[in-house]
Swiss-Prot record:
Predominant subcellular localization, coarse grouping: cytoplasm
Described purpose of this protein according to its UniProt entry: Decarboxylates ethylmalonyl-CoA, a potentially toxic metabolite, to form butyryl-CoA, suggesting it might be involved in metabolite proofreading. Acts preferentially on (S)-ethylmalonyl-CoA but also has some activity on the (R)-isomer. Also has methylmalonyl-CoA decarboxylase activity at lower level.
Protein name, per record: Ethylmalonyl-CoA decarboxylase
Origin species: Danio rerio (Zebrafish)
Keywords for the protein's UniProt record, in alphabetical order: Cytoplasm, Lyase
Keyword Transferase among record annotations: no
């Protein structure tokens, strides 16, 4: 077995341990979710497409629903998003995923047809639980994730941006947590993640004020990492995003994935549990091909 083959085997073994530590309950995919799955399947339309660029190690996940719906999630799209996350979790050659919307808009949340059909507390909570689980797994992927925001990211679309490690906006894009106007609060985990990103005071401002966040304000409060020098719908944003993320994914995929795993554990676990996870992940790269190559070619740091 080659050195890369050996380290991949160790990474696969560690992935199981990391998932156990992070308590990612994949059993949710059956049992309690059966009823809501059947109801979501009744609302087709749109798609969640996944393209894996093997050469760069970047995947592009595109949320697509006709322009009139501004890429709102139909029921079937929610199920499809979960399937795409499943695929990304086992992509051993991957380094990053860019989440974008089609046709110059990011996402406007849930399709109103599906929302009206499950407008009762029981179904609403089941849908909430399903999407919380999916977006939590998206954020925990062993890939560096970037939300590429063109046009508008509204409601659940704004929540989707918080399920990525970084957020990039085109110069004319807007993020808005409009839940208050619908008589709601975020239900896909967006509030909890938003507090972690910008703090409770700023999160309270955005949620209670339903304020439109333009790129400058977003960067000022720490929600946005970079403002791209292009406009929505020009067809240039994805190339800009790939260029922006390139320095962060330079190197072998096993090392990039290992870095993401220890950051996730440090963010979500107690110190003792995070240290245990760090030791486990460290063991997958210590003495691995990248480590040995670096020791041979770089005897001293400069």
């Amino acid at each position: 077995m080659s050195m890369w083959g050996a380290v991949r085997c160790r990474l696969i073994q560690t992935r199981s341990a990391v998932r156990k530590i992070l308590q990612q309950n994949r059993a949710f995919c059956s049992g309690s979710s059966v009823g809501i799955r059947e109801k979501l399947l009744a609302f087709p339309g749109g798609s969640v497409e996944l393209q894996k660029l093997q050469e760069s190690g970047i995947a592009v996940l595109t949320v697509s629903n006709p322009p009139a719906r501004m890429n709102a999630f139909s029921g079937c799209m929610m199920l499809e998003l979960e399937q795409r996350v499943n695929e990304l979790e086992i992509w051993t050659e991957g380094k990053a995923v860019i989440v974008q919307g089609a046709a110059g808009n990011f996402c406007s949340g849930s399709d109103l047809n599906a929302v009206r059909a499950i407008a009762n507390p029981h179904d609403g909570m089941k849908m909430c639980e399903f999407m919380q689980n999916t977006l939590a797994r998206l954020l925990r992927l062993p890939l560096i994730s970037v939300a590429l925001v063109e046009g508008r990211a509204l409601g659940g679309g704004a929540e989707l941006t918080t399920a990525c490690d970084f957020r990039l906006m085109t110069s004319d894009a807007v993020i808005q947590f409009v839940h208050k106007h619908m008589g709601l609060v975020p239900g896909w985990g967006g509030a909890a993640r938003l507090v972690g990103i910008i703090g409770s005071r700023n999160a309270l401002k955005l949620l209670s004020g339903a304020r439109k966040v333009d790129p400058d304000y977003g960067k000022q409060m720490g929600l946005v990492d970079e403002v791209l020098q292009c406009s929505s719908g020009e067809g240039k944003a994805l190339a800009h995003a790939e260029h922006w993320i390139a320095p962060f994914i330079k190197g072998p995929a096993p090392v990039i994935q290992a870095i993401k795993k220890v950051v996730v554990s440090g963010r979500e676990l107690s110190l003792d549990e995070a240290l245990k996870c760090e030791r486990s992940v460290f063991g997958t790269v210590w003495g691995g091909p990248a480590n040995l190559e670096a020791l041979a070619s770089k005897p001293k740091h400069k």
